[in-house]
């Protein structure tokens, strides 16, 4: 059994995990694997199951907004430690409505099976994980480990002075300046 033990739960507050991407990308399969790995109580909300329960198959812009708010409300009502929600969330507004603690973008296909969704989908610029291959076990292990250790994708404040060193972008600080001044002095 693959259960991650790590640092345990991060405080007492429920954590919302959004698994989003095009239809057919593997969101549901990944959500199913991830729920097995997180400790404590885990609730999994699948968008199709929620739509079925509420008999709401409206995929217009307003219908999708309503669905994102519904997913948020259902997550907020939960007393679980983690709530995993897998839904397309094609627009930033829908992702923001859900207010995830962690966002997983399943980016494994170029186009989904529904043309209207393909046209509406805006690739996210903010996410914690970008899944690029359909290997749910591998990615669930990776994501669970990072969630349990609260390791996030690095972010930078591009308004601050930065420099590219050793092939990666990082904040510029006095130590870097000293290294460059020493190198230039030679």
Report each predicted region and the residues it spans.
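Glycine-rich phosphate-binding loop used to anchor ATP phosphates in small-molecule kinases
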Residues: 62-110
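The conserved Walker
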Residues: 23
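Hydrophobic anchor at the beta1->P-loop junction of P-loop NTPases
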Residues: 19
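Conserved lysine of the Walker
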Residues: 27
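Nucleotidyltransferase catalytic core that binds NTPs
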Residues: 152-186
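Conserved substrate/cofactor phosphate-moiety recognition/catalytic segment
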Residues: 32-73
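Small-molecule kinase domains that catalyze NTP-dependent phosphoryl transfer to phosphate-bearing small molecules
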Residues: 97, 106-154
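Short, Lys/Arg-enriched N-terminal segments with co-localized hydrophobic residues
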Residues: 1-13
């Amino acid at each position: 059994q693959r259960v991650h033990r790590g640092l345990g739960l991060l405080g007492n507050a429920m954590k919302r995990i959004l698994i989003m991407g095009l239809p057919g990308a593997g969101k549901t399969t990944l959500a199913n694997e991830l729920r097995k790995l997180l400790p404590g109580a885990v609730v999994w909300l699948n968008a199709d199951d929620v739509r079925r329960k509420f008999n709401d198959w409206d995929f217009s812009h307003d219908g999708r907004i309503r669905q994102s708010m519904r997913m948020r409300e259902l997550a907020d009502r939960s007393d679980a430690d983690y709530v995993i929600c897998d839904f397309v969330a094609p627009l930033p507004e829908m992702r923001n409505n859900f207010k995830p603690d962690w966002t997983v973008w399943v980016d494994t296909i170029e186009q989904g099976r529904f043309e209207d969704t393909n046209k509406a989908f805006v690739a996210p610029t903010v996410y914690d994980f970008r899944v690029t291959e359909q290997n749910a076990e591998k990615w669930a292990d990776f994501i669970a480990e990072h969630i349990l250790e609260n390791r996030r994708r690095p972010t930078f404040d591009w308004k601050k002075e930065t420099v590219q060193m050793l092939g990666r972008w990082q904040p510029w600080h006095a130590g870097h300046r000293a290294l460059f001044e020493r190198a230039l002095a030679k």
